[in-house]
Regions:
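Long extracytoplasmic/lumenal interhelical loops at the membrane interface
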Residues: 110-113, 119-180
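Hydrophobic transmembrane helix bundles of membrane-integrated enzymes that assemble
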Residues: 1-116, 164-220
Length: 220
């Protein structure tokens, strides 16, 4: 599947191009978040009904792996919250697949991007990634008191390639605060919490286990 989305030129021919060939045709973390919440929902559903085959966990992990590093990191939360012993063979098979790719194909541009934290860990650099380092060093800052209260009313800058987001930040929290202040950010959290709770009420008898774990995943 190709993509009809118009994206910045830097994504075409880059190591992130593999993420364009998905149903959502997106090269950004939203694709990881979609598959992550799908995995979380299926694990929660299976915890209640115990009807889904364990091999589905392996396939979901493989699908999520090609969507981005957000899935790779946060899927651990879902697995720990809804762990079943019968998932162990699928988890071991997935771990072996990841280690084999990271060990034998670290120079492959797609593997290098998707499994960067694992590759760094195998080479003694710790479980880190360039995107996390960039976020911590270049995109996080403390807004002024005025920005917290009144905000700047800006979300995008109008640039097409670099610096598209106001404040040149890649942090979702800061983007909301700069746009509408801390009150607006709290409203966004409240709306997210409302929909997560509605899903829990409709599917999982209002399970706070699902509500809190899903909200933690979405908050990150």
């Amino acid at each position: 599947l190709s993509t009809n989305a118009v994206l910045p030129a830097r994504f075409y021919g880059s190591e992130q191009e593999y993420r364009l060939y998905n149903i959502t045709a997106t090269a950004f973390f939203q694709l990881s978040l979609f598959y992550l919440m799908l995995l979380h929902f299926l694990l929660a559903y299976n915890a209640k009904h115990n009807t889904l085959p364990s091999i589905l966990v392996f396939f979901m992990l493989c699908i999520g792996l090609i969507s981005g590093r957000t899935f790779l990191l946060l899927s651990v939360v879902s697995i720990l919250v809804y762990f079943k012993w019968r998932y162990v063979p699928s988890l071991i098979a997935f771990a072996i697949l990841v280690l084999l790719l990271a060990y034998f194909l670290p120079e492959n541009p797609y593997v290098a991007h998707a499994l960067e934290p694992v590759i760094n860990l195998l080479h003694g650099a710790g479980f880190v990634s360039s995107s996390t380092d960039t976020l911590m060093k270049n995109h996080l800052f403390m807004p002024t008191l005025k920005q917290f209260i009144y905000a700047d009313g800006m979300y995008m800058t109008g640039q097409l390639e670099v610096g598209r987001y106001y404040g040149h930040t890649d942090s979702g929290f800061l983007r909301q605060i700069l746009y509408g202040g801390v009150s607006y950010a709290l409203v966004c959290f409240a709306v997210t919490f409302y929909f997560v709770r509605k899903v829990a009420l409709n599917w999982f008898d209002g399970s706070w286990k699902f509500i809190l774990s899903a909200f933690v995943i979405l908050a990150f």
